[in-house]
Design a protein with these regions (language model features):
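Extended catalytic core of nucleotide-activated donor transferases of GT-like folds
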Residues: 2-84
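A short, active-site helix/loop in glycosyltransferases that binds the activated sugar's phosphate group
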Residues: 73-123
Length: 123
């Protein structure tokens, strides 16, 4: 609860007045109230699979990737291709270099799936 209050205070210092909800794994459904889940990383695939239990329209997902060089980041980016993400979900790429690399990784994974299992449809 202290983290929520601290975060609310920070938002208020920037002139924002939105309510801040604390969502725990036991209360995942509270994300419907928030309407968007910001995750400070590119791991949106895992989060989109969790969301399926509540419906794809329950909330949107927003992630960010600052680096794409680590194996964890690369795995997360590859996972985006086959995850149940929707057009209202987004991954923030803070530079054109990061965006270019993200798009290259995603396209390489799509090409791999085309070649290996004759995949033809991607979202």
């Amino acid at each position: 609860q202290e983290e929520v209050e601290n975060f609310s205070h920070i938002l208020n210092s920037f002139g924002r007045s939105e309510n801040v909800l604390q969502v725990t794994k036991r209360r995942y459904s509270r994300l419907r109230e928030a309407s968007v889940l910001y995750y400070p990383g590119p791991d949106l695939g895992k989060l989109s699979r969790h969301r399926r239990f509540f419906g794809d329209h329950a909330w949107s997902l927003c992630g960010i990737t600052h680096t794409t060089a680590s194996s964890g980041a690369m795995d997360a980016l590859v996972d985006l291709v086959t995850s149940p993400l929707r057009e209202w979900d987004g991954l923030v790429c803070p530079s054109s270099a990061v965006k270019g690399h993200v798009l290259n990784v995603i396209e390489a994974q799509k090409e791999y799936l085309r070649r290996e299992i004759a995949a033809t449809k991607f979202t």
